[in-house]
Amino acid sequence: MAVITKIEVQKRSKERFNIYIDKGQGEEYGFSVNEVILIKHGLQKGLEIDEIALGNILYNEEVQKAYLQAISYLSYQMRTKLEIEDFLRKKEVGQAIISEVVSKLLHDRYINDKEYAILYTRTQSNVNRKGPTVIKRELLNKGVQDLIITHSLQEYPKEKQIENALILIEKKKKSYQKHSFLQMKLKLDEMLVRKGYSRDVIQICLEELKDEKDDEKQQEALHYHGNKYYEKYKKYDGWTFENKMKQALYRKGFSIDEIEIFLQMKREEG
């Protein structure tokens, strides 16, 4: 049995208190607690506490400490239940305490995976223009349940997906101006897959791109690559030269007809 002999406010934190006790051998430092724990257990000078009571006080102090760590972590941005659990594990908090902290955070509505998923979907679709497949994978990695994700993705209709995909295409296609139209389409297709768009949405967007095909730019790309390969293969004669040129340009996405026209032009120049 111990008796509390003195309670003093810590100099560096007005919300924490040092508790001094006497176990029969004079006053000594016992432990420190948060103000919440001080009030919860009614700690005051003269109070007698046994080992069981002390154990409960110290356990609740650890819970409060972990709770405040979680609150601080949440102050930067919203987090999922799993993210909070992982954060506390890295702080070497025990599982029993983690469970209590998460339960309290859920009760106080500091964490709510449904609200998090909706906000995350809106942000990733509107700001980063990610497709639903990537958003779903990222939410799963954050521990959000599949049913909650399905509900949150209703915030991201197909029309918005198409709008975002077309914006991404418009930005990216400028960097493919020296590619053939076919090769540009393939690269844009790959980009949209990486971004998380469905095959259906990609097909619709690339069909719209077909209507914008620029013959002049296609010819510029053909001449750019054709002249590069011409310099590379001009040391060859006849069939070998033409075969290497055709294979190289075909791999770049140009049609046989386009390649033949280019080679005919080179024959006439020569």
From Swiss-Prot:
GO terms for biological process: regulation of DNA repair. GO terms for cellular component: cytoplasm. The keyword Cytoplasm applies. InterPro entries: RecX_HTH_1st, RecX_HTH_2nd, RecX_HTH_3rd, Regulatory_RecX, WH-like_DNA-bd_sf. It holds the Pfam family RecX_HTH1. It is found in: Cytoplasm. Keywords: Cytoplasm. The keyword Thylakoid does not apply. Gene3D superfamilies: Winged helix-like DNA-binding domain superfamily/Winged helix DNA-binding domain. Belongs to the RecX family. HAMAP family: RecX. Modulates RecA activity. This is Regulatory protein RecX. It comes from Bacillus thuringiensis (strain Al Hakam). The lineage of its organism: Bacteria, Bacillati, Bacillota, Bacilli, Bacillales. The gene is recX.
